[in-house]
A protein has these predicted regions:
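Active-site acidic/histidine proton-transfer and metal-coordination neighborhood
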Residues: 1-99, 109
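Histidine-acidic metal/acid-base catalytic patches
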Residues: 20-21, 83-194
């Protein structure tokens, strides 16, 4: 546990040293053989210790959802999957340096919507990971099943003017690592011009 805290404290210090004002954290890699309550308590305790360090460094921690049991082939953690779970954690900790990162693929897999996220978090959303995908993971733009243009319109309708990142969708594109970004940027440029 202490090694984990030191690791994340180093990440916070590195982010601050690089001039980054945000650091995205998630619960991937959680132990599936432990009770959810224990995992929740451990995550809350870790964040409780990290939030003051992040605030002192001028870094905002963004809690990102992870794939859960609803996606068994790529499940990352049994907790902190849905918008409701992230909302409960934010309310439990109630710290100004803690926000969220919206990942459109995980959002969709959990049955949430952009409107759900903005209804819960609005000013707590510090980053949007705009990524296509399905229940088997992330895909290059247009190769998943998600309504990406609808997500863009929803973000615009909600007045989101913050940063958007494009997640590199894993090992399937190792032979062409630039391909997913090229697809996403082409789609985004087309959307902006429309």
């Amino acid at each position: 546990r202490e090694a984990t805290l030191r690791y994340y404290e180093s990440c916070i210090a590195l982010a601050a040293g690089l001039g980054c004002d945000r650091l995205v954290l998630d619960a991937s890699g959680a132990c599936w053989d432990r009770k959810d309550e224990l995992l929740w308590r451990s995550a809350a305790d870790t964040l409780y210790h990290l939030c003051p360090a992040a605030q002192a460094a001028g870094v905002r921690l963004l809690l990102a959802p992870v794939m859960g049991a609803e996606t068994p082939l790529i499940a990352e953690s049994p907790i902190l999957n849905t918008a409701a779970e992230l909302d409960a954690m934010l309310h439990q900790l109630n710290h100004p340096s803690l926000g969220v990162c919206l990942d459109t693929n995980i959002m969709s897999a959990c049955g949430d919507t952009v409107y759900d996220w903005f209804g819960r978090f609005r000013d707590k959303i510090g980053l949007v990971r705009l990524c296509d995908g399905n229940y088997h993971g992330w895909r290059a733009w247009g190769e998943g099943v998600l309504p990406m243009q609808r997500y863009l319109h929803a973000l615009d309708a909600m007045g989101y003017r913050g940063d958007i990142s494009l997640r590199l969708p894993g090992e399937r594109y190792l032979a062409q690592p630039a391909y997913p970004d090229e697809r996403a940027l082409a789609a985004l440029c087309g959307e902006v011009g429309a």
